[in-house]
Curated annotation (Swiss-Prot):
EC number: 2.8.1.8
InterPro entries, per the entry: Aldolase_TIM, Elp3/MiaA/NifB-like_rSAM, LIAS_N, Lipoyl_synth, rSAM
One annotated GO molecular function: metal ion binding
Cell compartment(s), UniProt: Cytoplasm
Protein name, per record: Lipoyl synthase
Positions with a binding annotation for [4Fe-4S] cluster 1: C78, C83, C89, S318
Comp. bias intervals (Polar residues): 7-17
Cofactor binding summary note: Binds 2 [4Fe-4S] clusters per subunit. One cluster is coordinated with 3 cysteines and an exchangeable S-adenosyl-L-methionine.
Biased composition (Basic and acidic residues): 21-33
Enzyme class: transferase
């Protein structure tokens, strides 16, 4: 475990003012206040010159996209997870839609999505999503979600409803899904998804197995590999995809070993990007990976047989997902 972390076996009693309020929008420290890991602020590393975020321009579609999303009661992971690429993506008229609410049942200390008791599923969401995608005239969309451990199918049927209704209104649109791990309900979820599979199936491994306890509490490395392999077995013509972050304390060799595991489990596409801490209340960045190292990861990925590898400091799993799929020959 990193020196920047202290594991806690129980949470201290909260004062009335600190009690969890499911109706209040979580911000900053609220998002990590109830995780099982205590984050002790570490010395902040200076960002290197190669970490550059593109801001939205006045002539871009940034505010238009935000207005359309709010009008249709939709959430994007771009906003909820404080993605550094939001200005560029919204500016180009693209977004990764996040379904099933903005509260996750998991408590991963690298993630800026709020944690808490989720709201009931919005039965109108699949229709709202489909109409928004049609309104934006998108050729390629990514649909992701929070973890919903409170649902018997983990939200698999809601994914299928979103996919099917989107295809009804936009039959030419390619759909990539970035799904949770469906832990405890894997077979049920895969049975449901098989009725209406996406065009690309994505589930992020996130980090190396040694760091799962501190970075992905509640998740299991082998289970995530099994999810993608089993989906591929059932849907051999649908490409599978997964992503990793670097900068959490892993070594280069550990990243390469995960990449080998991915190929051994029939994962086709890969993304690797630099972890950037959303705030001082999240896991700290323990290293900034040099562009030469990213280049090495990319070269090794193609040697291993990945059909496409998007590797670089600002790469995220859904960043330029349409271009990734096109370059891999899937879109």
């Amino acid at each position: 475990m990193s020196d920047a972390l202290i594991a806690t076996s129980s949470e201290a009693p909260q004062s009335p003012a600190e009690q969890y309020d499911p109706t209040r929008k979580q911000k900053s420290a609220d998002k990590t206040a109830r995780i099982p890991i205590k984050i002790v602020p570490a010395e902040k590393l200076k960002k290197p010159d190669w970490i550059r975020v593109k801001a939205a321009t006045g002539s871009s579609r940034f505010y238009e996209i935000k207005d359309i999303l709010r009008a249709n009661n939709l959430v994007t992971v771009c906003e909820e997870a404080s993605c550094p690429n939001i200005g560029e993506c919204f500016g180009k008229g693209t977004a990764t839609f996040m379904i099933m609410g903005d509260k996750c049942t998991r408590r991963c200390p690298f993630c800026d999505v709020g944690h808490g008791r989720p709201d009931p599923l919005d039965v109108n969401e699949p229709g709202n999503l489909a109409r928004t995608i049609a309104q934006l005239k998108l050729n390629y969309v990514v649909i992701t979600s929070v973890d919903r451990d409170d649902l018997r199918d983990g939200g698999a049927q809601h994914y299928v409803d979103c996919i099917s209704q989107t295809r009804e209104l936009s039959p030419a649109t390619r759909i990539e899904v970035l799904v949770p791990d469906f832990r405890g309900r894997l077979d049920k979820a895969l049975d449901i998804l098989q009725a209406c599979p996406p065009d690309v199936m994505n589930h992020n491994m996130e980090t190396v197995p040694r760091l799962y306890k501190q970075a992905r509490p509640g998740a299991d490395y082998e289970h995530s590999l099994k999810l993608l392999q089993e989906f591929k077995r059932r849907n051999p013509n649908v490409p599978t995809k997964s992503g990793l972050m670097v900068g959490l304390g892993e070594t280069d060799e550990e990243i390469l070993e995960v990449m080998r595991d991915m190929r051994a489990h029939d994962i086709d596409m890969l993304t690797i990007g630099q972890y950037l801490a959303p705030s001082n209340h999240h896991l700290p960045v323990l290293r900034y990976v040099h562009p030469d190292t990213f280049k090495m990861f990319e070269e090794e990925a193609y040697k291993m047989g990945f059909t496409h590898a998007a590797v670089g400091a600002m790469v995220r799993s859904s960043y330029h997902a349409d271009q990734q799929a096109h370059q891999a020959g899937f879109a």
